[in-house]
């Protein structure tokens, strides 16, 4: 039985990763340099209505709220920021996992899942941050691409 559960989880992960690639938002003048995608690994479908906050580290080494949103029916958030505002720096994406699971009647272990990353240090890039959630674990991955790809 454990083998079947593990197999289903792996298949859900493959589906998630295959659909987590960058989405075209108008070609070279794309206004979507940061996109978030969230999958509910327990139910095997997009995680809808997950609150997400993006913070940027300041010169004073504190985190300042940079952007926020809520995942749509596809488990995605587009247009969190624009190319002009998304400069080089250290960013943190915070997924509010406790609110998501409690709304489904589940008591989770984690309150938040955070992804901290350096953006645009090697030139301007577009980022897709993907998270796969379950009540007691989470995994993340990122797809980094040139805006013209």
UniProtKB/Swiss-Prot annotation:
The protein's location, in the record's own words, is: Secreted
**Swiss-Prot/TrEMBL GO biological process terms:** purine nucleobase metabolic process
Q: Which residues bind L-thyroxine?
A: 37, 76, 139
Q: Which domain of life is it from?
A: Eukaryota
- One Pfam family, please name it: Transthyretin
- The reply on keyword Signal is yes
Tell me which tissues or organs this protein is expressed in.
Detected in plasma (at protein level). Detected in liver.
SMART domains found in the cross-reference section: TR_THY
Sites of the modification 4-carboxyglutamate? 64
Matching SUPFAM superfamilies, A to Z? Transthyretin (synonym: prealbumin) (SSF49472)
UniProt-listed PANTHER family: TRANSTHYRETIN, URICASE AND TRANSTHYRETIN-RELATED
Q: What does this protein do?
A: Thyroid hormone-binding protein. Probably transports thyroxine from the bloodstream to the brain.
Q: How does it assemble?
A: Homotetramer. Dimer of dimers. In the homotetramer, subunits assemble around a central channel that can accommodate two ligand molecules. Interacts with RBP4.
Name used for this protein in its record:
Transthyretin
Q: Which organism is it from?
A: Petaurus breviceps (Australian sugar glider)
């Amino acid at each position: 039985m454990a083998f079947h559960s593990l197999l289903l989880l792996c298949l859900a992960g493959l589906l998630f990763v295959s659909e987590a690639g960058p989405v075209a938002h108008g070609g070279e003048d794309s206004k979507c340099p940061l996109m978030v995608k969230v999958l509910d690994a327990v139910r095997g479908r997009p995680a809808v209505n997950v609150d997400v906050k993006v913070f940027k580290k300041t010169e004073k080494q504190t985190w300042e709220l940079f952007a926020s949103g809520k995942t749509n029916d596809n488990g995605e958030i587009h247009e969190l920021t624009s190319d002009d505002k998304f400069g080089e720096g250290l960013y943190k994406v915070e997924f509010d996992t406790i609110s998501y699971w409690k709304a489904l009647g589940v008591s989770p272990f984690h309150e938040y899942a955070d992804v901290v990353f350096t953006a645009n240090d090697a030139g301007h890039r577009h980022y897709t941050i993907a998270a796969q959630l379950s009540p007691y674990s989470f995994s993340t991955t990122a797809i980094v691409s040139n805006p013209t790809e």
